[in-house]
Amino acid sequence: MDTIQRASHKALIRLLIEKRRASGMRQRDVARKLGRTQSWLAKIESGQRRIDVCELCDLARALKFNPDKMVAKIARIAKQE
């Protein structure tokens, strides 16, 4: 199965969106903070683009959350796939 279709990837995206919304930031704000475009983040959040671990760490820094906890949650979901 393609990574983008996996439950673990969908959970990752859902968690990232929750973190961004909780921070009160818009896609444009986060992207600008990372030197990226809003469309880059929109593609990630819509599941059209995979995210690598370095990008996850960048997003975690921008949104001020611990990526370790998120990865642990995703790993638990991935074990069930």
Locations of the language-model features?
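Short, charged recognition helix plus adjacent turn
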Residues: 1-2, 61, 69-81
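DNA major-groove recognition helix of helix-turn-helix/homeodomain DNA-binding modules
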Residues: 35, 54-70
